[in-house]
Regions:
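Bacterial N-terminal signal peptides that target proteins for export
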Residues: 1-9
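Extended, compositionally biased eukaryotic interaction scaffolds
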Residues: 4, 16-19
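Compositionally biased alpha-helical segments
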Residues: 21-136
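Bacterial N-terminal signal peptides
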Residues: 8-16
């Protein structure tokens, strides 16, 4: 009986030890690597402007948005400005201005995350904290 109790204790300890690691994802202080180099200027809701390169949305180099009930993806190279509005539920209103001059109202997930490099460190910001993104 004593051996059984020791065995059970060892199994429980082993389970706790294997569960102590992190859940993966990006290491702290890094940004997702992308094939395309995108430059952007992010303005947060407090008015702070941050110029970035290697810009991405959830590690992708395109805007992943909803247009009505449909899904729309627009490469960042075609965008001039994103103006983010208020969140309703899990979505945020976003006004998109393309470099061609076309303006449209879309929605994005408010939990979306934007990444970029400042040249002196990694920059990460949640969509709900962004007021505007300009693409030079």
């Amino acid at each position: 009986m004593k051996r059984f109790a020791v065995l059970v204790l060892m199994v429980v300890v082993a389970l706790f030890c294997t569960g102590m690691g992190d859940l993966g994802g990006q290491p702290e202080g890094t940004i997702p690597e992308t094939d395309v180099r995108i430059e952007a200027k992010v303005v947060d809701r407090t008015g702070v402007e941050t110029s970035l390169n290697q810009f991405s949305m959830d590690g992708k180099t395109y805007l992943d948005a909803l247009r009505g009930s449909g899904q729309l993806t627009i490469p960042f190279q075609q965008l001039a400005t994103l103006s983010l509005g208020k969140a309703t539920g899990d979505e945020m209103a976003v006004q998109v201005k393309l470099k061609s001059g076309v303006v449209m109202d879309l929605a994005i997930r408010k939990r979306a995350v934007f990444y970029g490099s400042t040249g002196y460190g990694a920059f990460v910001i949640k969509a709900r904290d962004v007021a505007r993104i300009d693409f030079p």
